[in-house]
Structures are given as C-alpha cells and as structure tokens.
C-alpha cells in the first residue's frame, strides 16, 4: 500500500516516516480554506482511486463541506457534512444525549445573542462552582478562516460574570457545565452504517494541559459497559460510518460516565489502539476499498502509550504553575508524585512510545528538533 502525506509544510512528522512514499504541502486550511481545498482537489485529480484520510477537525470539516467535488476522484470514508457537524456541536449533542438517556453534566446554555448575564449567572450558581465554560464548537469557521475556541473555568460567580461579559460578542453558544472530577475515558469505534466493526477503549492517566486535554499517557482498558452502550446509541442515532471517538468522564460522585463530546475523526492516541491490536486506519481503508474485513475479536488490555514530549510539557506545567493556576481538581497528585511518575515511566515495560520506533525513528527526531527549536 502506497501512503502519501500532506501537510502545511514540506516536511511533517508523518512525512518523515519510512512508510511515507510521497509527500506534498498545501496552504493552511485554517487561514485559507479555499486554497487548501483546491490543492487537495488538484492532488486527488492526479491520484484517482485513492482513499483520503483527513486527520484534524478543520481538514475533515473543509473536505466534507465540499465532498461532492471530490467523490468522483477519491474515496472519503466519513459521514456526510451535516451529520459530522451535528455530532461536533456539543449543544446539539447534549440535547440528543438527553433523549437517549445518556448521562451528561448539568449544563446551562448561553446563546450567542443572549444578553441576560444576570439570569445565566443565577442559573449557573444553582449548579455549583467550579464551573466549566466551553463553546459549543471547538473550531469555528469565520470569513477570515478558522479560529480555535478554548475551555475556561470559573471558580465563583464573579469569575463567571467576567467570562460572559468578555464573550458578549461570541459567534457560537456557550455551554456552562458542572465540573466532573474523574478520569477521562475514550470509546473508539469504527462503524459501517451504524453497525460496529471494531472497538477500543482507553483511560487518560496524564493530559496536556493537566486540567484536561490531549492524553499524553493513556492505558488500554476493557470498554466499560455503560460508556460503550452510550457511545453506540449516540453513533447509531447518526447512522454513523467511519471512525469516531466518544469521550466521557467517570464522575467520582456517582460512578456514572458523563458525556463530554464526539470527535468524528482519528484521535491523538491512535497508536495505542494499533499497538493493542486494533488497526483502525487499515480497517477503515479496507472498508473504503470494499475489501473483506476480518474484525479483531479483542485487544490487549493494559498496554500504555506515552507521548514523551507531551508528557514533558505536562511535567513543566506542573512544576512551574500552582494547582489553582492550572485549574486542577482538589485530588490532583502533588508535584513530587508527578515528577516520580514521570521518571518511572522510562522503565515501565507496559509503556509503549507513541512516536518513537527503533524501526522508524524519523518522526521522533523531527518532532524533537522542532520541540528544541521552539525552546531556544
């Protein structure tokens, strides 16, 4: 199988792999979405019959938005844009989850034209602090390209009021949620017309940023029955085809898995699933190519995957900032414990490297070079 890698620069992490047969660069999909799409279209026209895997929210969104212009040249094994957008919209997703009986955090919605800040604060205060403030969309398309919308925290009503006033001209609604303290759980599925082809699950041990984000140390686990059932019901509601990650948090108070979001694309810790025996990219390729699929009957539980440089960032943040500055929960491990666990990970035989491979070291050295250059 010949693999080509596209990126915003001539060289990229994946393109440095020995398994990349070709590489090309395209204009930024964030700043110039139309030029990005045209570049992909030109490449697709020269490589008809290929299977196309966009890897980020923005590239998936842009290609699905104009999918009809590509469908005669390449196969894009994802749901249509409408379903992808509906699943990515957290406000819409939570409404659907409620109808399906899927547990969710207590939430108040603040519309983008809502000026009743006093009413929102009063309602949110009934939930109790601290609160999580997040936009309904993680990436927002504007006339000038895409922007990223981040998650923030409010420890009291005054902090919440300040955040709402700062977001008075927001372009998308906000979700104001109770903060769920507990480990992050990911359910990863490949489906074909709503039917599960393959599955995997992990828990996040450490994240970047430490308050919650990208998993930098994750462990493969048996899929919890409640979380798997919830993820399946949600994706079947969308009649999903392709891969998806459904993210939950295990609420320590009631031991229920509370829905966070759906990512209708490949995820950052994908290598852990592959190392554990579920090769989602190859399975999706087989599905797209119409080949017979032999789904894995199970996977290795207990393997851990570590993104070394992301874990180093986690350590630096914990050492440089206080728990309050990082918005950490009360039971967050001490700095000493974090340092000890970081060091012990180098000799833990259950931990696999997410990027580094002796047989294919190019991606790691590329990433390390860029990491060091950013520090200098």
Which role does the model predict for each range below?
Residues 175, 241-246, 294-300:
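Flexible, glycine/charged-enriched surface loops at secondary-structure junctions
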Residues 1-79, 113-119, 342-345, 350-374:
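ATP-binding N-terminal substructure of ATP-dependent carboxylate-amine bond-forming enzymes
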Residues 84-174, 193-195, 225, 229:
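Active-site nucleotide/adenylate-binding loops and adjacent lid/helix of ATP-dependent enzymes
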Residues 157, 268-287:
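Gly/Ser/Thr-rich active-site loops/lids in small-molecule metabolic enzymes
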Residues 236-271:
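Conserved metal-phosphate-binding beta-hairpin within the catalytic cores
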Residues 206-209, 214-216, 263-277:
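Glycine-rich phosphate/pyrophosphate-binding beta-alpha loops
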């Amino acid at each position: 199988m010949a693999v080509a890698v596209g990126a915003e620069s001539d060289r990229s992490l994946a393109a440095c792999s020995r398994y990349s047969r070709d590489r090309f660069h395209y204009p930024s999909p964030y700043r110039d979405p139309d030029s990005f799409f045209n570049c992909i279209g030109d490449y697709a026209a020269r490589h008809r019959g290929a299977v196309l895997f966009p890897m980020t929210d923005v590239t998936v969104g842009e290609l699905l938005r104009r999918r009809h212009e590509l469908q005669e040249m390449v196969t894009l094994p994802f749901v249509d844009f409408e379903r992808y957008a509906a699943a990515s919209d957290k406000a819409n997703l939570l409404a659907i989850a409620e109808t399906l009986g899927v547990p969710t955090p207590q939430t108040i919605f603040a519309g983008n034209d809502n000026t009743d800040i006093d009413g929102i604060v009063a309602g949110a205060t009934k939930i109790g602090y601290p609160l999580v403030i997040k936009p309904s969309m993680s990436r927002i398309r504007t006339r000038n390209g895409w922007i990223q919308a981040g998650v923030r925290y409010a420890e009291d009503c005054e902090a919440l009021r300040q955040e709402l006033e700062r977001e008075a001209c927001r372009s998308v609604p906000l979700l104001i949620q109770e903060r769920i303290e507990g480990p992050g759980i990911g359910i990863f599925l490949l489906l074909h017309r709503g039917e599960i082809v393959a599955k995997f699950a992990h828990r996040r041990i450490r994240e970047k940023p430490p308050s919650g984000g990208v998993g930098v140390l994750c462990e493969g686990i048996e899929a919890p029955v409640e979380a798997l059932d919830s993820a399946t019901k949600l994706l079947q509601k969308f009649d999903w085809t392709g891969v998806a990650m459904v993210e939950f948090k295990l609420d320590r108070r009631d031991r229920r898995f509370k829905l966070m979001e759906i990512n209708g694309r490949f995820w950052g810790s994908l290598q852990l699933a592959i190392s554990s025996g579920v090769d989602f990219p190859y399975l999706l390729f087989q599905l797209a190519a119409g080949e017979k699929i032999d789904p894995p009957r199970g996977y290795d539980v207990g393997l851990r995957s570590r993104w070394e440089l992301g874990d180093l960032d986690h350590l630096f943040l914990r050492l440089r900032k206080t728990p309050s500055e990082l918005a950490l929960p009360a039971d967050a491990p001490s700095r000493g414990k974090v340092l000890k666990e970081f060091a012990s990970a180098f000799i833990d035989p259950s931990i696999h490297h997410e990027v580094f491979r002796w047989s294919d070291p190019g991606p790691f050295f590329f990433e390390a070079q860029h990491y060091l250059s950013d520090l200098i």
